[in-house]
Amino acid sequence: MSEPQDTTSPSTAAAPITASTSQEQSQTQSPPQVSATTTSSVTATAAAATAAVASPPVNGAARPTEELSCLWQGCSEKCPTPESLYEHVCERHVGRKSTNNLNLTCQWGSCRTTTVKRDHITSHIRVHVPLKLHKCDFCGKAFKRPQDLKKHVKTHADDSVLVRSPEPGSRNPDIMFGGNPAKGYATATHYFEPALNPVPSQGYAHGAPQYYQAHHPPQPANPSYGNVYYALNHGHEAGHASYESKKRGYDALNEFFGDLKRRQFDPNSYAAVGQRLLGLQSLSLPILSGGPLPEYQPMPAPVAVGGGGYSPGGHPPAPAYHLPPMSNVRTKNDLINIDQFLQQMQDTIYENDDNVAAAGVAQPGAHYVHGGMSYRTTHSPPSQLPPSHATATTSAGPMMANPATHSPTGTPALTPPSSAQSYTSGRSPISLPSTSRVSPPHHEGGSSMYPRLPSATMPDSMTAGYPTTSSAAPPSTLGGIFDHDDRRRYTGGTLQRARPEERHLPEPMDLSHDNKDDGERTPPAKPRQAPSSPGRISASLIDPALSGSANEAETMRTAQAATEVAERSDVQWVEKVRLIEYLRNYIASRLERGEYDGDSGMTRESRTPEAGPDGHMEGVETEPVSHPAKSESPVKPEAGGDTVMYPTLRGVDEDGDSKMPN
């Protein structure tokens, strides 16, 4: 039993021992260590650890016959080990401040690094000395300086868990030099103590680590391997972002309904409708899925839960989000009014300029007003302007007698001849029933916001205050007395610019021979046919723009570009139609399910003028019935009368008691 101790004691005393010799000694000592006593085992293990730290195979230690030379300037001393060489440089060449020989400039070879402290220069010397005392616990790589090891450990930040997570039935991968514990660090001095114990595999019956399996119980902590379950925090962030995006769409939809109620834009203007719907198409609306009302249902689970399944570092499930109710669609009347506005917008989209022109409703000979007066946002010319010649306003009668389809831009598809002023009218849609004035064409204050005014969709009762000669046309289509021939001047200029191009067509033809008799024109017919050649005909009569192949390619490209533009416009039109249908289905679903404020809705319905003949006015007066007996008197005669109007109600309120006995 004393032989192993005698063998190991010289190994600790002799410093220049190679790595292979120390490892062979540790291998030969391992069998007696198992059967030896505790004291002998600890002594042998400590000796093997000291030998491994003193001369590891990656440290670059010299062989017993080699020595390390000091390359400091003017020094030729040789040291047996890296430790002794490092101590030699620090004590002899660097010195100390207490001994008054401190040197802060490195003179190793051609290095002239200068520092400000002794600790800095001693740390710098480790770069030149082949001494690597700092080892990585993950891969076993050794480094000269601790800061180098710190930088190296950061590379294991992503894959450290995977490296330290053993597979079922395998040995501990943290043994750095093979499966034999005698090589490298000894098991007694290693950071992970149970090195030879196999990893229990009952916790890994499912194979690869699964992040969303909540049925597996948490495994006990084992120091031999790291935890393979990460804390999933990305789910909460993604869910929060999804909730924010849906809330933005929800608020935008509520604002859109509010604009409809306040008539902020004209539902009969195709340009205004398209521009307003464009803001909703770019957002994720919560109603596009076709489901029920979103504010009455909780958000889905991925929105609120921070991590799915079992995650030791995950957050507890948070309560589901609830969107607030829409403030602009609380009552039943709001839903009905908004549905009517959406129907107007739907009719506007279906009956825009392109569809009306395709149906043949537009006038083929009508030219349009100069672009400076119309403020149109679309590139297509309006097809509802009158012809250039002025006619009497009474001619609008037979034209408006037909149920002409109204144009989405605010004027009917077949407007009267004097309706050009509807493009520059400064009146808002709200002021149409109350005003009887047509703004002059030079007053264009509101034309940018309201480029087109509703005309064909207005009821006939709104034009009752106008003269009979113009009662067939709505107010926005009446011709004003402030014309000053502006319309005639603009349209005449357009025709004058187009006519010279038409006159160039008959110029190449020789019209001088057409006035002569057949006898004078017949004799020179043969001489003219003889010199005529295909080249001469192509040069004089054929348009050069139609002869080249390059022009044909340009024509094809132009046609293709026009086709693409038409396809894009069709796609935009389809998107607008679908969005309007979704909105109308949403309003209809709320009306069917009764998802509105019932108290205020019933109150508003009971206060409408239509509720008088039905007897619903009694329900409004149910509260004051029990207190005064006289409060019932004005209610009964009103319920019995069929011709009760608002002026009559005010009269009843004044002297209701006097009419009660009658």
From Swiss-Prot:
Principal localisation: cytoplasm
- The annotated regions of Basic and acidic residues compositional bias extend over 498-523, 595-619
Instruction: List where in the cell it is found.
Output: Cytoplasm; Nucleus
Family per record: Belongs to the pacC/RIM101 family.
Keyword Iron attached: no
What residue intervals hold the motif YPX[LI] motif 2?
A: 646-649
Which PANTHER family does this entry report, sorted A to Z?
A: PH-RESPONSE TRANSCRIPTION FACTOR PACC/RIM101, PH-RESPONSE TRANSCRIPTION FACTOR PACC_RIM101
Q: Which organism is it from?
A: Aspergillus parasiticus
Region spans: Disordered: 1-42, 370-541, 595-662
- Show the SUPFAM superfamilies listed in the entry: beta-beta-alpha zinc fingers
PTM note says: Activated by C-terminal proteolytic cleavage by signaling protease (probably palB/RIM13) at neutral to alkaline ambient pH.
Q: Supply the source organism's classification.
A: Eukaryota, Fungi, Dikarya, Ascomycota, Pezizomycotina
Supply the name of the protein: pH-response transcription factor pacC/RIM101
- Which cellular component, as a GO term, is one annotated location? nucleus
